[in-house]
Amino acid sequence: MNIIEIIELKKNKKKLSQDQINFCISGLVNKSIPDYQISALLMAIWFNGLDDNELYFLTKAMIDSGKIYKFHPEYKKILIDKHSTGGIGDKVSIALRPILVSFDLGVAKLSGRGLGFTGGTIDKLESINVNTDIDLKNSKKILNIANMFIVGQTNDIVPADKLLYALRDVTGTVDSLPLIAASILSKKFALESDYIFIDIKYGQGAFCHDIETAKKISNIMKNLAKKFKRKVYFVLSDMNEVLGNTVGNAIEVKEAIDFLKNNSDVGTYFKKLMFDLVTLILLKTKKCKTKKEAKEKINYVLENKIAFNNFCNWIELQNGNIAKIKNDTFFKPKYWTNIAAWKSGKISYKSIIELAEIGVDLGSGRRKKEDKIDFQAGIYLHAKSNEKIKIKDKILTLYSSKPIKQDLIDKAKKIIKIS
């Protein structure tokens, strides 16, 4: 087979066969095809797309490039996997799993790190010392005891995706919808769960800038899931606001734990999305018959600390700092500064991406993959867009392990509008 002929076919809007796609992915992984030729193919796909069959062939080839995590028949409970396309302040994955375990469900997840303004679940968990570098054997052991685990993506799970993404990242092909669908679902299908729930974010702080794009990608993934005969459900959620009151790592874990403890100090939209997602999962898995029943049962497991206890059991098995979690001392930044309202009025933020960039400047995110994260760095939002505030009311609190520079404070103030 000839890679140049395959590139020419896709360039001229022709369909690729399964053998041709397998040849390309195999050549990518074993390095028999140079990066520049795979990059040319990616650009041809960006311009001309993939039909349903081509996308199935690509996703299958990506899955087959590595190992598949299997838990049944040894594990008897329904196994859930939930994925988010990422957003600012998204700590849903941390809070969701302990609640689902309360309903006799198992929850497994392969997760990633953050780059830029979106924080990764792995970074957030490492802020409380959770070990996410766990192999399949130990993942099964933790699942059997705690009915949940979260681990980082390893080199033996869909290695083709890691290689493809690195090329997409430097060739302007990250935003190809078929390539996004293949990337997400290859990782989800490499873990053999019974149900997959995908939260597709849209808006300022998401890769889908509008709901129409979110609908397109969800439809592509729905068709792909049917070809694999997998149960996949989608939620489209607004990312024009920070999800919750916090942005960072340990500070986001704290808000997730506050939710599990049924404390009131959590963001309204975060709480609503949590209830919506858990309700959907309980209905689809037939753990509840109605939305009303689901809401009542969710409130019960929160009010009685059942979900929080599940969280603690799981964290302890993955070597998290359980003592600091139980006595609420894991988030203790050395430096902080408050930004207060200079007049009364209605607040708005110029851009939540710029707000998230302040968090990165404080140390909560990475500019480059090798950057070290300050787990104590972050932002607390005392006021959200369209809320009325009075003069001297706190708007933001900035946190860091290092002294916070005045130019960063000034930068944060410029994002705030009071009308």
Curated annotation (Swiss-Prot):
GO biological-process terms attached to the record: pyrimidine nucleobase metabolic process; pyrimidine nucleoside metabolic process
The catalysed reaction is:
thymidine + phosphate = 2-deoxy-alpha-D-ribose 1-phosphate + thymine
Arranged from A to Z, the UniProt key words for this protein are: Glycosyltransferase, Transferase
Give EC number(s), comma-separated. 2.4.2.4
| A single GO cellular-component term on record | cytosol
Write one Gene Ontology MF term.
1,4-alpha-oligoglucan phosphorylase activity
Superkingdom as given in the UniProt entry: Bacteria
Q: Name one Pfam family in it.
A: PYNP_C
What EC class is this?
transferase
The record ties this protein, via NCBIfam families, to:
PRK05820.1, Y_phosphoryl
Q: How does it assemble?
A: Homodimer.
Q: To which protein family does this belong?
A: Belongs to the thymidine/pyrimidine-nucleoside phosphorylase family.
Q: Could you tell me what this protein does?
A: The enzymes which catalyze the reversible phosphorolysis of pyrimidine nucleosides are involved in the degradation of these compounds and in their utilization as carbon and energy sources, or in the rescue of pyrimidine bases for nucleotide synthesis.
The name under which this protein is listed is Thymidine phosphorylase
Q: Which organism is it from?
A: Mycoplasmoides pirum (Mycoplasma pirum)
Chain's gene name = deoA
